[in-house]
């Protein structure tokens, strides 16, 4: 079993019977900037805080996962009404850290001792697993990429947006700024977790921001990225066209292309064929989720192979690149030429 060295820290935040909130324990250390964003997300200070048990998002280059628990009279936590267990990690894997945070939270309810949490945390960090008699077992190796993929639901995404799913696919392929809106946090986190599976050849999670509040520090962090997939619960995001090229409104089942991005997201015959292909895949009940993802990836590879075949000019570093002149000589329709240029730029294959 491999050690889980992606783990960075573990913290406990408690809300007592008087409504006071306190960071009672952290290991090895947590920064003030991390405390600020976690405090905003878990919202323990509110009298009507979210009933969402497990939430996740990112802060700078790291991910955080929060498991919130109600405390009952039978638990070993007198005067504590609620607590949140917070994990910071280097990797994006909500399923893995939901299980781990649940095991740790159950142990804290039972014992009320941070030292017990520390023992389990160190076991996971050094051995990749921890085991308790009554509160469950965690094995990091159980959450490999294949099992994570199987638990996505691209079929549901395509059924929701039908032929317009191609806009999401193309925006991801061309590294555009995508904002996903849903008023429900639970639904937002569920839907936005599907997007990386559409681009199997690329690590979309590097530019994934599952839950962004429209506050200065989070927006400043978002704007440091030239492309991203960002989730938002605030409906006013629809007027912030400075933040997106494509807006996906989940409850309304609507996709909006910002006016400044319409030319680069113009659909070609190839796009329409892929759109129809994805709809047919979603309707075919004999296909598993993994097969749907694999079929879409094959279509993506066909596009990339077509692009590579046009890379005939040697760049400064010796790599074969695509030039505007090469595309001009092909006498392609404007929309196709424009798409290939944008794809070459996204794949770092365009010679300026």
Show the residue positions of the predicted features.
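Acidic, Ser/Thr/Pro/Gly-enriched alpha-helical scaffold modules and adjacent low-complexity linkers
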Residues: 2-352
